[in-house]
Amino acid sequence: MEDEEEEARALLPGGSDEAGRETRAPPAASGALQALCDPSHLAHRLVVLLLMCFLGFGSYFCYDNPAALQIQVKRDMQVNTTKFMLLYAWYSWPNVVLCFFGGFLIDRVFGIRWGTIIFSCFVCIGQVVFALGGIFNAFWLMELGRFVFGIGGESLAVAQNTYAVSWFKGKELNLVFGLQLSMARIGSTVNMNLMGWLYSKVEASLGSAGHTTLGVTLMIGGITCILSLVCALALAYLDQRAERILHKEQGKTGEVIKLTDVKDFSLPLWLIFIICVCYYVAIFPFIGLVKVFFTEKFGFSSQAASAINSVVYVISAPMSPIFGLLVDKTGKNIIWVLCAVVTTLASHIMLAFTLWNPWIAMCLLGLSYSLLACALWPMVAFVVPEHQLGTAYGFMQSIQNLGLAVISIIAGMILDTRGYLFLEVFFIACVSLSLLSVVLLYMVNHAQGGNLNYSAKKREEMKLSHEE
């Protein structure tokens, strides 16, 4: 206890030495170091923020390894598109369940610090097993690796958000979430543009292409997961130290999951779920498969196709915080969701039925993808009571992962049997169903008072009137 008090005193500007004498004012360099070591100081929290951002970098970098190496995986492992897409399906399957229990495990079982470390270990182990599957030419081992990777990936994102809430409050929090999302998109972008180049370098070193080259490339990519694990360990130490010095509680997700709440979900909430699933199944499986489409239809090189494929994430990185601020300032969530879905539909139609430069469609897709996330997910909080938020978001993520798992397999089957045109028509149908759900949501919500489409000013007025 005396050591804790001494450490806390040492961080104060007027800290005293062992004899209780006043110490001299520290020089500028010493003052800066003191600020970095003080958990209550902004400089220290910025260090923590940097670690938080890199905590999920490895997971997002490695998630789309299959998309970046689509040609190489199918050729070296001698699998068709249906089997290739199982690498995405196996990631999603565990998260159909874990979306409900990730927060519970962090709050009640492991705690935020151990939970983050354990989920980071799952991500690392999963990526290593995935790479070993390539080295030993065992596709089933690659599937197992993706399953283990999936167990850690989504739950690690929950832990990342929990740390953010624990260290940052109020308006700071929106910026922190925006920065974390931007870093995630940077991870995906770097993967799309780096892994193909890395494969060619490994191929040159080993003398030939093949499953061994693929496995070694994936193993090198796994270094990013080790970086994330190091960040998890550093965060655990700094969080424990801050708890000891500032006497603050360990961060918790605050989620309360009650599956019985599902029966009370309103029609607008179910429509939001349908919009979410039908929209995202036309984004992530599409990104996983579209690289070969760009080389076959438009004649791009493999590296150029990767660059086009990554533009969705490139745009999302800076635009997500900007669109988040825009939606916060204007309100009108349904209108913004409608704009995002219509733009996405236009992008898929362009890619399917025209020979226009695909950069146009993919840039539009990047903008609409960023806008939808900022406008759709906050709407859940407007249609369910606060005590049901954990269940609602858990259920939304669960059926999203279920949809991604099923549609990934279906998309692979369509591509194997019918080709890219039919696949694009399938994605257009999914987005059209999402668009129909947005229109229905607008009509239902309008009949119930229209709170989802209030302007920001009207929401503030309603909030003030309720407080009075």
UniProtKB/Swiss-Prot annotation:
Gene3D superfamilies: MFS general substrate transporter like domains. One of its GO terms (molecular function) is dipeptide uniporter activity. GO terms for cellular component: lysosomal membrane; lysosome. The chain crosses the membrane at residues 42-62, 86-106, 116-136, 138-158, 173-194, 218-238, 270-290, 307-327, 334-354, 364-384, 395-415, 421-441. Keywords: Lysosome, Membrane, Transmembrane, Transmembrane helix, Transport. A motif (Dileucine internalization motif) lies at residues 11-12. It is found in: Lysosome membrane. It catalyses: L-alpha-aminoacyl-L-arginine(out) = L-alpha-aminoacyl-L-arginine(in); L-arginyl-L-alpha-amino acid(out) = L-arginyl-L-alpha-amino acid(in); L-arginyl-glycine(out) = L-arginyl-glycine(in); L-alpha-aminoacyl-L-lysine(out) = L-alpha-aminoacyl-L-lysine(in). It is a multi-pass membrane protein. Residues 1-25 are annotated as: Disordered. It comes from the Eukaryota. GO terms for biological process: dipeptide transmembrane transport from lysosomal lumen to cytosol; protein localization to lysosome; protein stabilization. Homodimer. Interacts with lysosomal protein GLMP (via lumenal domain); the interaction starts while both proteins are still in the endoplasmic reticulum and is required for stabilization of MFSD1 in lysosomes but has no direct effect on its targeting to lysosomes or transporter activity. Lysosomal dipeptide uniporter that selectively exports lysine, arginine or histidine-containing dipeptides with a net positive charge from the lysosome lumen into the cytosol. Could play a role in a specific type of protein O-glycosylation indirectly regulating macrophages migration and tissue invasion. Also essential for liver homeostasis. The dileucine internalization motif is required for lysosomal localization. PANTHER family: MAJOR FACILITATOR SUPERFAMILY DOMAIN-CONTAINING PROTEIN 1. Belongs to the major facilitator superfamily. This is Lysosomal dipeptide transporter MFSD1.
